[in-house]
């Protein structure tokens, strides 16, 4: 097999593995949401809030692609479950921001702990240099996914 074919096969394998990982990730988060009594979109929206910090419902709608009405219902559910709070924006009292509260929820940490521990165990199989390369690759792949997400939203 020539280097070109070998490289091409490796690239195809990368695409297949990322598809597999993406599918397993979606299925895992669906199961996690169900275990928490949430819809998958609710759980991922709470995750977006944890990652990005407090934001308005409109900003959350832009990030998720959900309509205003859907975001309102989603925030209502998350607030009722104790995963977010609506607070007045300290910089503009006319605005309300959605504040994540999930980081302090022990049962969420407990739910994700085995996955975190398994991931850390996997990391221990690689050298620091290998991990830096892996993280660079995965980070760039995440950037590509973000770009493709934005493209699909247009």
UniProtKB/Swiss-Prot annotation:
**Which keywords belong to this entry?**
DNA-binding, Transcription, Transcription regulation
Q: Which domain of life is it from?
A: Bacteria
Cross-referenced InterPro entries: ArsR-like_HTH, HTH_MarR-typ, MarR/SlyA-like, WH-like_DNA-bd_sf, WH_DNA-bd_sf
Name the DNA-binding segment ranges.
Answer: 57-80
Q: Which GO terms describe its molecular function?
A: DNA binding; DNA-binding transcription factor activity
Q: Which gene encodes it?
A: ycgE
Q: What is this protein called?
A: Uncharacterized HTH-type transcriptional regulator YcgE
PANTHER family attached to this UniProt entry: TRANSCRIPTIONAL REGULATOR, MARR FAMILY, TRANSCRIPTIONAL REGULATORY PROTEIN
GO biological process terms held by the UniProt record: regulation of DNA-templated transcription; response to stress
Q: Which CDD domains match?
A: HTH_ARSR (cd00090)
Return any one Pfam family short name. Answer: MarR
Positions of the HTH marR-type domain? 7-143
């Amino acid at each position: 097999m020539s280097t070109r074919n070998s490289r091409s096969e490796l690239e195809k394998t990368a695409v297949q593995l990322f598809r597999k990982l993406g599918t397993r990730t979606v299925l895992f988060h669906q199961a996690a949401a169900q275990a928490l009594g949430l819809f998958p979109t609710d759980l991922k929206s709470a995750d977006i809030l944890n990652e990005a910090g407090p934001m308005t419902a409109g900003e959350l709608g832009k990030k998720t692609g959900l309509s205003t009405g859907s975001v309102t219902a989603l925030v209502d559910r998350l607030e009722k479950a104790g995963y977010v709070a609506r607070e007045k924006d300290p910089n503009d009292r006319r605005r309300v921001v959605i504040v994540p509260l999930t980081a302090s929820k022990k049962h969420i940490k407990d739910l994700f702990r085995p996955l975190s521990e398994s991931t850390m165990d996997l990391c221990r199989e690689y050298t620091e240099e290998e991990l830096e390369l892996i993280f660079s690759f995965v980070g760039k792949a995440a950037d590509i996914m973000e770009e493709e997400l934005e493209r699909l939203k247009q």
